[in-house]
């Protein structure tokens, strides 16, 4: 990242396993130094600065030639640059310096949760088309029925999958692969809660799936995209991948390159 400047909490979250909140605590505890001087919460790390945590030098990843943001998209935001209907779009919430970052897939207007964005087209394309696991917390109307469970286990093919979709959707039929996994958290006549894991990203896939069983989706939150978890990231906030996530991303990209080269 040539010419970069980051607040100390961002730097630590970017290049270590610590969250921004944990990084702030480390700074307050006096465990962080910049060029051998104790860091403050307002300290900014510049390109040639040396940052130490507990006297150990933090070395930025030399092979990281791209950046990836993790954004906790709120409900009521569109994953788009602009909207003719004047609805709020994600780039109105993100800092202007991220205007050139592209989203990895979509998360519909009424849903919230993990949305990844990157300044690398190759990374965006790889993450979008790799069939990585996506984990969701879903709240639906009514009971989780045996028919639903059978479809989650065995898959489902619908010639008419427009229920749960936008009125003007061009996608009429849809085939749903068996879910990777699911857990029924609450099963009640008024509403039920599930944790589901899928590895597809079709248009309003989960809303269409549950609508077929007359179970409208009341709430939908994506809590994991591949190796990136939402964890405690507040709604409307963004962070960089941490060191562990970047390591996993580099391994993932290297593996894809090796597969293509075979």
From Swiss-Prot:
The keyword Isomerase applies. One of its GO terms (molecular function) is RNA binding. PROSITE patterns: PSI_RSU (PS01149), S4 (PS50889). It is an enzyme of class 5 (isomerase). The active site is at 108 (nucleophile). One of its GO terms (biological process) is enzyme-directed rRNA pseudouridine synthesis. Pfam families: PseudoU_synth_2, S4. It catalyses: a uridine in RNA = a pseudouridine in RNA. Residues 6-70 form the S4 RNA-binding domain. Its EC number is 5.4.99.-. This is Uncharacterized RNA pseudouridine synthase jhp_1352. It comes from Helicobacter pylori (strain J99 / ATCC 700824) (Campylobacter pylori J99).
């Amino acid at each position: 990242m040539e010419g970069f400047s980051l607040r100390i909490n961002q730097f630590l979250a970017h290049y270590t396993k610590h969250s921004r909140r944990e990084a702030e605590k480390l700074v307050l505890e006096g465990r962080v130094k910049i060029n051998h001087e104790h860091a403050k919460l307002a300290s900014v790390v510049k390109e040639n600065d040396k940052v130490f945590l507990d006297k150990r030098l933090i070395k930025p990843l030399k092979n990281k030639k791209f950046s990836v943001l993790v954004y906790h998209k709120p409900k009521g935001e569109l994953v788009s640059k602009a909207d003719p209907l004047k609805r709020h779009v994600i780039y109105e919430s993100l800092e202007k310096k991220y205007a050139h970052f592209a989203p990895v897939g979509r998360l519909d207007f009424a849903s919230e949760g993990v949305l990844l964005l990157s300044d690398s087209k190759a990374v965006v394309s790889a993450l979008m088309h790799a069939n990585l696991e996506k984990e969701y917390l879903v709240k639906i109307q009514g009971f989780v029925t045996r028919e639903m469970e059978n479809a989650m286990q065995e898959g489902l093919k619908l010639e008419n999958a427009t229920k749960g979709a936008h009125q003007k959707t061009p996608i009429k039929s849809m085939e749903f692969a068996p879910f990777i996994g699911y857990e029924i958290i609450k099963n009640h006549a008024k509403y039920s809660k599930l944790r589901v894991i899928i590895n597809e990203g079709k248009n309003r896939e989960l809303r269409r799936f549950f609508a077929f069983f007359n179970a409208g989706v009341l709430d939908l939150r994506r809590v994991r995209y591949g190796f990136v978890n939402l964890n405690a990231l507040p709604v409307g906030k963004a962070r960089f991948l941490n060191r562990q996530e970047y390591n996993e991303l580099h391994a993932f990209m290297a593996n894809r390159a090796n597969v293509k080269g075979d």
